[in-house]
Each structure stands twice: as structure tokens, then as C-alpha cells.
């Protein structure tokens, strides 16, 4: 968010005392760097691939999270903050087309106001919403928003999802 030069570059963030990898960019994931992996075990991969390494800054993450959550509250009065980077919104009453347009607007607003790219997954349950979000992140065809409402689409999404990737 604060350094556009890092866009599309491999990046990792380390835990307290810089012991383990706590988050990685898509580019760092593609290098095989795993979540929770001890930093010393991947130091060579990091050096070889010019991966940018940052110490964690929880105060900053909390502030950015609060900004995003406040934006979400402007789109739905029913927001359940699940974690520092996840929330569930009730979007009852939307038709499919309106829902897609609304979700794209939410996504665009968060990017414009907070500078953070987000993916949005919509489903009738939290688990289906999480699966939809996973698909929205991984498949560019969704353009960051995946809605699992129709039975065929839900079945297709479930068949594509490994059981160990299912939340809950």
C-alpha cells in the first residue's frame, strides 16, 4: 500500500523477533515459501530470488484493518469482523446482477479509500462464502468477486476444492 515499487514483487513478512514467515505475496508463494516456515530455512531462497523481507508491524495492520472494516460498515449494517483481514457481511435482498454490481463497488471503494486490494466471496453460508472468496482470489476470470448462488456453480466449486482447503 505504501510502496508501489513492491507491486508484483516477492515479499514476506516475519513474526515477532523475525523468526517465522507470517504472510507472503503471491510471488513469494510461487517460490515455494510456506506460511509459518522458519526464516532461517528459506534464507537462501529469499536471497537467490531477491525477496523483500519485512518485520511485522501489528499497529499498522490494526489501523489498516480498522479502516477497511469502517468502509464495510457503510455497505451493510450487519458486519461480523472475523479476523484482522476478514469479515462477513449480510447482503440479503439483492438479486444476482445487483449483488455482483454491489460487490464490485465494495471492492473498488476499499481499493480507492484504503489502498488495499480485496477479494469478495458470496455464498449462503460462511463456508460457501470462504470457498467463493478463495476462487475469487485464484481465478482472474472472477475479477475479484465470486458469487456461489446457483446449485450448479456451488457443486462445481465444491468439486474444485480440496477437502483440506474447506474452512470450518
Sequence positions of predicted segments:
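Short secondary-structure capping/junction motifs at helix and strand boundaries
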Residues: 51-52, 77-82, 99, 111-120
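Generic non-transmembrane alpha-helical segments
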Residues: 67, 71-75, 105-114
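Helix-hairpin-helix
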Residues: 85, 120, 159-168
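A short, charged helix-loop
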Residues: 140-163
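Catalytic palm subdomain of template-directed nucleic-acid polymerases
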Residues: 89-107
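Residues that scaffold, gate, or flank divalent-cation-dependent active/transport sites
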Residues: 1-84, 88
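Structured, non-catalytic alpha/beta "coupling" segments that mediate domain-domain communication
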Residues: 115-134
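Short, hinge-like loop/turn segments at secondary-structure boundaries
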Residues: 30, 99, 136-139
